[in-house]
């Protein structure tokens, strides 16, 4: 199914490997406000080892993006860190979404240890205001984003739900308001936001952050907020995500 979705959307999946184990399943429950709770049945992604990684592909990409779900299991952790280090060493922009799912971790301390480990390799990070205290030991947006910047993260984006997105770039901070939305389901909103940001950064050339000014970054985040709002207005995850034409038409 996932390979079919990639094909239908014109995504190159030449690096995709098929394992004997089943695909991990996420069982998502949605309450009356559109907020979610998760249960997981883990599968093939937990078995990925460094030898499975196409290092040349990672080092020749414009952007490498990963999330913290692949840091929850031993061998997959090794593969994830190996790939991020290879890309970082080659000068590839490394993007990180430390999406905290308590059900996937033994303890919060374990999550903190492994979710913060890749930060020195990361150029761009997207996290929620709920995840900020876990990674930085403060809920203050200015101070928390400053602590991430001190660890080497160039662009920090903190999603605030209906309050929009807080950003730190080159020592400057600003907030982009959210679009008013009748929320059906928030599932996939963060992934849509990050995908939209990376799409716009990728269009900037071989060095996506080079020469990026605050005004352009603000416009990129407006675009991403709009994309996420469209996802929230629909039920589901992948089926709820808008096309590029839909986002541009809604701005």
Set out the residue ranges of the language-model regions.
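Conserved N-terminal subdomain of the carbohydrate kinase-like
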Residues: 1-68, 248-251
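Short, hinge-like loop/turn segments at secondary-structure boundaries
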Residues: 4-8, 31-34, 111-115, 143-145, ...
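Short glycine/serine/threonine/alanine-rich loop segments
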Residues: 11, 92, 237
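Conserved beta-alpha-beta core of the PfkB/ribokinase-like small-molecule kinase fold
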Residues: 69-147, 154-155, 162-165
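Short gly/ser/thr-rich secondary-structure transition/capping motifs
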Residues: 43-51, 104-110, 138, 209-210
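Conserved phosphate-binding/catalytic region of the ribokinase-like
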Residues: 85-86, 137-251
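Acidic, amphipathic alpha-helical patches
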Residues: 53-54, 115, 144, 183
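Glycine-rich phosphate/pyrophosphate-binding beta-alpha loops
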Residues: 23-24, 68-72, 228, 234-237
